[in-house]
Each structure stands twice: as C-alpha cells, then as structure tokens.
C-alpha cells in the first residue's frame, strides 16, 4: 500500500521525518500559543474554566491524498520529487565545476580525458529529471485536495492532528525544512483553535455550529493571518520560516491565500476587532466579513483623527 511505501521513503533518511516533526511541534507549541493569546487577546482557559486543545503527530495519509499519489507512474518519481532539494544542489555543483573545469583540472594536475563530456551528460540527466518531476507538480497535487492533508483541527473534540507523512513529502518537494513546515502547520491549526474557542473579555467564544458553517475564506483566512504573523515575528531569528510560509502559500487554493487581499491593508488590531465582531454577530458570509473590517477601519481612523495629539 502507498502508506507503507511513503513510510519507507521518509524513514530511510539520516533522521526519521516523524521524529523531526514531533520535535519541531513540541518546541513550537508554547511559543505559538503565547503569540496567539497576545495577538487575539483571547484565552482558551480562565480560572473558572479549564479547556485544553492537545495536538498529536499521527501516522497515515488521507484517502484522497493516497488516491492522488497512486496515480504516479513509478515510485521513483515520488522519491525524486521528495529529494528535489538534493537534485537542485547537485545541478548547481555540476554547473560550478563545468564553468571552471579548466582551472579545476589544472589545480588537481589532471588531464581532461572526457570529464567535460561526463559533466555535460550529468547536467543533462539532472535537468531532464527536474523537468519531469516539475510536470507532475507534487505540491499542487497534494495541496489542492479539498481536505486537511498536513494537519487538522477537530473542533468538536477539540484537538489537533499533525500528519507527518504529507509534511515530509511537501517539505521535500518545496525545498523547505521539515522543521519549518511542521511549525507552520501547527501554528495554523492552533490559530483555528484560538479563534474558535478563545474567550474574549466578556467570556464569549465562537459558537461551534457557527464556526463550522462560516465561509472558509473567513476561517482559513484568519488562521493564515495569525500564522503569517508569528512567522514575521520570528523572522529575525529564523528568516527561513517566513520564506517557507510564502513558498507554501504559492501552491495553496484561494481560501488559504485570499487573506493577503486584506492582511496588508489593515492593522492587526482591525483584524482582531473584526474577528470578535464576526463571532459575536454570527457572520457567515465573506462579503459581510470584509464589510465589517472596512467599517472598523473607518471608525478607528475617525477616532484617531479627532483625538488630540500627545505633545
């Protein structure tokens, strides 16, 4: 079965992918929760109410993903796509040698007895392999499935599952680290938990039925907004994290990407007020959400305009 083949692929590396995902999520957990509490001003628990949203790193592939991967012509394609970063590195190294071959041979006192031909053949082979795997478009193949393939927030339980196998595949295909992708997936799912269950100052949260029926552009957009936010906050210490977020974003469907249309136009406080208003007023439609956000922006600008300056 496909699951066992992928397990073998991801476990044959120096450090098992599952262990990397587990460690990355464990290290990220508290920092992400603290960020979400600060940015949303929402609390999962308070003195009179104990609420937990645990996460688990789990085995397995969603059936829809398994069916997509079974369409690949050969297992070797999966291996090569997951190892794209190594192919890119090899291609760059061969190009470097090719451009400086004469000096390299002189430095090592070697004769050019076919090295140029061998290099050209190797370069051509890697280029052909990269062309072939680029045609398959593994990230789109996985990420355009209308199902949570790397992680899921189960709002009725509540709890989070992180799927290490798809994370390993997508990280390799996008040439980003498993650590960074694990962080991003956990942050996204925890953002769902905080926007849903987090209590505001009036001890109000998003009604579960309303949360479940709200347009995905709202629910996923808010989760993406706060995921991008923590990646930006950590950029000075880990610049690769934000780059990984944007690499992933390039391959995701509209519910995960459309937040960029409003994220850069509105301050985080405007988004926070919009989140609270959406929950309190049972807003389900995306156009209503956008209208609320624009109204809040105008009110804040109006208030700022009439307040006396602090001189």
Regions found by a protein language model. Give the residues of each.
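Fold-level signature of zinc-dependent metallopeptidase catalytic domains
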Residues: 2-24
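Active-site scaffold of zinc-dependent metalloenzymes
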Residues: 75-181, 190, 196-202
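Post-HEXXH active-site segment of zinc metalloproteases
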Residues: 180, 195-224
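A conserved beta-strand element that flanks and buttresses the S-adenosyl-L-methionine
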Residues: 186
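Hydrophobic/aromatic-lined pockets within catalytic cores
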Residues: 191, 195-199, 227-235, 263-267
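Post-HExxH zinc-binding segment in Zn-dependent metallohydrolases
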Residues: 210-244
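Pan-zinc metallopeptidase signature
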Residues: 245-311
């Amino acid at each position: 079965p496909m699951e066992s083949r992928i397990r073998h692929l991801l476990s044959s590396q120096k450090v098992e992918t599952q262990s990397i995902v587990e460690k990355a999520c464990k290290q990220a957990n508290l920092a992400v929760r603290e960020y979400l509490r600060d940015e949303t001003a929402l609390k999962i628990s308070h003195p009179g109410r104990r609420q937990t949203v645990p996460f688990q790193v789990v085995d397995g592939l969603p059936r829809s993903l398994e069916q997509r991967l079974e369409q690949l012509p050969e297992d070797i394609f999966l291996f090569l796509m997951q190892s794209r970063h190594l192919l890119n590195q090899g291609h760059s190294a061969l190009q470097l040698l090719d451009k400086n071959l004469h000096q390299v041979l002189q430095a090592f006192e070697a004769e050019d007895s076919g090295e140029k031909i061998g290099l050209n053949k190797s370069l051509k082979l890697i280029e052909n392999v990269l062309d072939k795997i680029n045609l398959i478009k593994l990230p789109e193949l996985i990420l355009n499935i209308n199902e949570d393939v790397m992680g899921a927030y189960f709002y009725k339980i509540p709890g989070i599952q992180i799927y290490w196998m798809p994370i390993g595949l997508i990280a390799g295909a996008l040439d980003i680290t498993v650590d960074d992708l694990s962080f991003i997936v956990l942050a996204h799912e925890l953002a769902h938990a905080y926007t849903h269950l987090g209590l505001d100052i009036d001890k109000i949260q998003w009604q579960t039925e309303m949360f479940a029926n709200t347009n995905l552009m709202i629910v996923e957009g808010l989760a993406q907004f706060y995921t991008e936010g923590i990646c930006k906050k950590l950029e000075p210490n880990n610049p690769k994290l934000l780059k990984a977020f944007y690499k992933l974003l390039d391959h995701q469907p509209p519910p995960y990407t459309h937040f960029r249309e409003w994220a850069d136009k509105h301050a985080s406080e405007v988004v926070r007020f919009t989140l609270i208003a959406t929950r309190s007023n049972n807003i389900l439609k995306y156009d209503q959400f956008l209208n609320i956000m624009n109204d809040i922006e105008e009110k804040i600008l109006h208030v700022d305009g009439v307040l006396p300056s602090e001189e």
